[in-house]
Amino acid sequence: MLDHGLAAVWGVDRGDDALGTIEWATVAGDVVAVVTLLVFARLGNHIRPTTFLAAGLVILGLSTAGSLIPGSATLLAWVMLVSALGAGLTMVASMLIVLHSTPRRGRGLSLGFWVAMYPLAMLAGEVLDINSPQNWRPITYGILAATVVVLIVVLTQPHREFVGTFDTFDLVGALLWLVGVSALAWLLIDESSPVRAVILGIIALVAFGALFAQTRRRGSAALIAAEVLTRPVVLAALLAITVLTFLVRFADFDHAAMWWAIDRELAPSDTPPIALFAAGLVLAPVAGFLIDAGKRTLVAVLGVVLLVAGVAATVVELQSAHTENGLLLGLLLSGAGISTLAVYLFYAVFHGVSPVQLTVVGGLAVTASALGAVLGEFVRQRAQVDLLTGYGLAHPSVFADIVGLIVVLIALLAGALLIVERRRSGSADRESADA
């Protein structure tokens, strides 16, 4: 919420050049998350998640305080980059704490509330009008005070979360992962030199090859435990998480209504984004409750139907309508579908995973989420199109390519969900036979 307001305020005060710098920092923050979150999560078997949570809160507090200091747009971009690191730490740590402290029968509802925190924060930003230069500073002071309070609570509460492994941390695997993913991210972003691209590709290939060999050698003690990679349910759920976050970032739901209003020379309204985030806030806990009640398949189907209907309705209304009514319906359905699927997928990826493997799978899950966001932004910027508003889609060949991409992504998402449900049904049947 804070970073969104920060970008808007500085874009107004400093012009397009400053906004471009901040957009760079936003993308760089997503890349930092992809590179580091798995390593941070894997350390959760050696260092208590509350320690990571405290570290993330300290970083967030410092970056929030730094954003209040007047300075150049470049300085502010670095503040946002550090903020992304702190947010990543708190995301991983809070997930691990929720998973370790919740019995399996109540894990769906807990994950539902955990997923709901994002739309809650974004909804608060819209209601409080954090994009206003007049409101941004007092809201920032409030966020800083809340961060300090939560940090004090974390430091003073007893630590009950699971920590335990007799294996030493796979430092070699962690270094290989950092090098490989960093090289791959640089390869995707950098356009300056074909020679550099070849070098980065070779570095990434060698690093991932060495990581594969290291994983085979260390087995369950590797950075990515070997047995996790042999679980089709986990792999399918990770793929689906990546596809979902790709679709969300590629479609750019947050700003669709703003561009729609500008295109029609209307004043942007807060109602459409409020509808998007409010629907996500409500449906996430509901999806978690239904999962705990044994309605997993219903949640998966409901999420896909809501998302497809929401995207279709939003695209149609953005192309033809001159009122917000249809747009509101599309964003309501989209927000509900996104949150419903997110809860289902995060639950699916952890189902049947042992406590020792939670850190590995948790790290992979948040990494998959960040990866989908990076790839979605990358494709959207390179294609120079906006799916929902129709910008850049006038040419028939471009439109056909984008439609084909969306069809493939939805097919991948549906296929991954089908694999998850079939594998889970097979496991349930075997457990019933054994009983």
Predicted regions and their residues:
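Hydrophobic transmembrane-helix bundles of small-molecule transporters
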Residues: 131-240, 248
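12-transmembrane solute porter fold
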Residues: 1-7, 63, 221-426
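Helix-loop-helix hairpins in multi-pass membrane proteins, especially solute transporters
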Residues: 37-41, 45-171
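Extracellular/periplasmic helix-loop-helix junction of adjacent transmembrane segments
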Residues: 3-36
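Central cavity-lining transmembrane alpha-helices of secondary-active solute carriers
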Residues: 24-42, 91, 95, 274-287
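Glycine/proline-centered helix-kink
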Residues: 113, 118-130, 181, 253, ...
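Transmembrane alpha-helical cores of Major Facilitator Superfamily
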Residues: 24-31, 58, 112-120, 243, ...
